[in-house]
Amino acid sequence: MAKLETVTLGNIGKDGKQTLVLNPRGVNPTNGVASLSQAGAVPALEKRVTVSVSQPSRNRKNYKVQVKIQNPTACTANGSCDPSVTRQAYADVTFSFTQYSTDEERAFVRTELAALLASPLLIDAIDQLNPAYWTLLIAGGGSGSKPDPVIPDPPIDPPPGTGKYTCPFAIWSLEEVYEPPTKNRPWPIYNAVELQPREFDVALKDLLGNTKWRDWDSRLSYTTVRGCRGNGYIDLDATYLATDQAMRDQKYDIREGKKPGAFGNIERFIYLKSINAYCSLSDIAAYHADGVIVGFWRDPSSGGAIPFDFTKFDKTKCPIQAVIVVPRA
């Protein structure tokens, strides 16, 4: 193994104007991992690079070289800085060769890897998070029909509207307290005041999404309740949101309100972020047989993609933007 020395990485960063100096930390005698760390940085926040060569398998005699970049980031879940919270994002590259590989073959692996990492293909894949390249790779070789190119995912914000869409349910304002909290009911009841219909600045097809980009991996559907990176929609579980547990945990802004009139019902309402109003959960439940879909968009400050499990949803990670009724398949 070469002597572990200081490594200077120049011409890095988006504009190629940054330099990173890495000082050797040493080699772990147990696993042979060589480690370097950013010079002059606070230990908890320094960048680190590790290089390791795995032990060869008994039969195949394969060696694997792994280069890993560790970028510690101090942040909280809501995106604010907090030096006491450290999260490490890893980027690693692994390539292998056998003990029978010649010097020329190993040198070719090194130079080929460097050229690949500098290619526009990888730069675009990383910068644009572009999922289209599997299609291009398939189309570039082999036989058979060529699949259509896949359009990349959209930004995490809602797409620009191509029209208008009005909420299919009555919408309400719940500001004035009708009854204060009690010992058995630790939340207030509000006066529900019906509002004039409000339009979303998107058309229905925008909310459901063009399948060529919104559903690019075919997992975003009513049945799988799976989000696609930052954007997605899910079948709303209005039954759960109407429970006392949902009122207590307040993962979403749910309020109890009394509808107008002497015989007005007391119901629970869910807040819709896009139109700044509330919608009755009983209305949503009544239409559920026909198919109710709630549109979600990830909040840019949440730092996380849409979860798999509905119970992990909350108003920060997945704010409810819109309620739309669509036929069930």
Curated annotation (Swiss-Prot):
Phenotypic consequence of residue 211 to A: In strain: Qbeta_3_FR
Q: Which GO terms describe its molecular function?
A: structural molecule activity
Supply the source organism for this entry. Escherichia virus Qbeta
Give any extra note attached to this record: This protein is translated as a fusion protein by episodic readthrough of the termination codon at the end of the capsid protein. Readthrough of the terminator codon occurs between the codons for Tyr-133 and Trp-134, thereby producing the readthrough extension.
User: What are the annotated disulfide bridges?
Assistant: none
Q: What does this protein do?
A: Minor capsid protein.
- What GO CC annotations are associated with the protein? viral capsid
Concerning InterPro entries, the annotation shows: Levivir_coat (IPR002703), Phage_RNA-type_capsid (IPR015954), Read-through_dom (IPR031819)
Reported effect, residue 207 to R = In strain: Qbeta_2_FR
Name-wise, this protein is Minor capsid protein A1
Compartments, record wording? Virion
Main subcellular localisation:
virion
Pfam families reported for this sequence = Levi_coat, Read-through
List keywords of the entry alphabetically. Answer: Capsid protein, Virion
Q: What happens on changing residue 191 to S?
A: In strain: QB_3, Qbeta_3_FR
